[in-house]
Amino acid sequence: MLSKRIIPCLDVRAGKTTKGIKFQNNVEIGDPVEMAKFYYEAGADELVFYDITASHEQRGIMIDVVKKVAETIFIPFSVGGGISTLEGMRAVLLAGAEKVSVNSAAVKNPDIIRQGSRAFGNQCVVLGMDVKHVGEKPGIASGYEIVINGGRSYTGMDAIAWALKAQDLGAGEICLNSIDADGTKDGYEINLTRLVSDAVDIPVIASGGAGTPAHLAHVLDQGRADAALIASMVHFGTYTVNQIKGYLHDHGVKVRKTW
């Protein structure tokens, strides 16, 4: 059995790391390059960066961050936010990222997944999914709907159906974020994670809601996720990565030993 991955997530706004709750009320918490170095040395298995104010004007700032991170750490990291073209993917990968994440852009143009996987390999293409629980309704059989544009726009797309389509198009991994749970520290959305993990054959990263090591143990076991994204619980010093890994190890979850 492969080790479960623990992945700190850094949201970057205009070159600075921020954190909010349910995509709102973001506060600045540090320099992304310094934080990347800290988490690398602290035992993280990977890192995820999201350019949350992605725009043409800000793109150069994020590329500069990616280059500096690639020079500083020696674990895989992915970058997402505002990447909507093959050229955008190429720029991020050439700057040093191992993976590129597409979210809203893939909903609007699903073929970007196919293009990216053919050009760079499916291991480089991560589908980011922002999901809200809306209950069963026509077109949303699972009760979970894909939302885009930072959670502001409902798409009418069922989360499970979209995950399966993206897998068929060539996505190599899914980062599954529950907006309902995001930043709450009340635990991951277990049912959603299990539904998606059971539906697809590619790795699923659970995101949104981590507050305690027990939450990670639950989503990696009962949610059947391959990896867990963490943010608030480590950004604000409540736990260290190695404390989390130690807890998981003690509770029967296989992790890469870094403590």
UniProtKB/Swiss-Prot annotation:
Catalytic reaction equation(s): 5-[(5-phospho-1-deoxy-D-ribulos-1-ylimino)methylamino]-1-(5-phospho-beta-D-ribosyl)imidazole-4-carboxamide + L-glutamine = D-erythro-1-(imidazol-4-yl)glycerol 3-phosphate + 5-amino-1-(5-phospho-beta-D-ribosyl)imidazole-4-carboxamide + L-glutamate + H(+)
InterPro entries linked to this entry: Aldolase_TIM, His_biosynth, HisF, IGPS_HisA/HisF, RibuloseP-bd_barrel
Active site: D11, D130
Keyword entries, A-Z: Amino-acid biosynthesis, Cytoplasm, Histidine biosynthesis, Lyase
Top-rank taxon: Bacteria
Entry EC number(s): 4.3.2.10
GO function terms (MF aspect): imidazoleglycerol-phosphate synthase activity; lyase activity
Pfam families given in the database record: His_biosynth
Record's keyword annotation contains Amino-acid biosynthesis: yes
Function recorded in the entry: IGPS catalyzes the conversion of PRFAR and glutamine to IGP, AICAR and glutamate. The HisF subunit catalyzes the cyclization activity that produces IGP and AICAR from PRFAR using the ammonia provided by the HisH subunit.
Similarity comment text for this entry: Belongs to the HisA/HisF family.
Subunit comment: Heterodimer of HisH and HisF.
Protein name, entry field: Imidazole glycerol phosphate synthase subunit HisF
Organism, scientific name: Desulforapulum autotrophicum (strain ATCC 43914 / DSM 3382 / VKM B-1955 / HRM2)
Organism taxonomic ancestry: Bacteria, Pseudomonadati, Thermodesulfobacteriota, Desulfobacteria, Desulfobacterales
